[in-house]
Amino acid sequence: MSDSFLEELRALIDVDDGVGTRARYSSDAGLTRIPPLAVAFPRTQEQALAAFDLARARGVPLTARGGGTSCASNAIGPGLVLDFSRHMNRVLHIDPDARTATVEPGCVGSTLQAAAAAHGLRFGPDPSSQNRATIGGMVANNACGPHATAWGRTSDN
């Protein structure tokens, strides 16, 4: 099944199932190692959704990944890993009046902080990994940081 799945996936999105890539993506900041079947690199929301749909239809486990900074092995899995940090990593819009930001899931926390600061705003969470941790991962883990009592966790922002 994996060969036909990968063939279908390659028609939709950039995929790497090489030994080196699978080894690099077999761990995050945690101690567990689980080699994935393959790693895909979506460039658009449509590509990500197409990969999600195909994985679901074929029963292939899917793990979304950003910076791989989770100490709890949340960024690894045995099926398809979607790495959002390579291409989907931008701050798309800051609305200072509404105090909101629209970002792609692979946007690094410190990148959002810098963009928000230009408008006199900040994104509350400041984990020690904020120069590598992505917003998608911060949302998934409800990240916080040393100033959480003042500025809140991700779910508070």
What are these regions (language model features)?
Residues M1-A57, G67-R99, S128, W151:
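N-terminal flexible segment immediately upstream of the FAD-binding catalytic core
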Residues P42, A64, P105:
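Conserved strand-loop elements at the edges of beta-sheets that form or border functional pockets
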Residues R56-R58, R65-G67, A133, N157:
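Short, basic and Ser/Thr-rich N-terminal targeting/leader segments
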Residues L62-A64, C71, L112:
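Extended, hydrophobic alpha-helical segments in both membrane/secreted and soluble proteins
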Residues V91-I94, T100-N157:
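FAD-binding subdomain of flavoenzyme oxidoreductases
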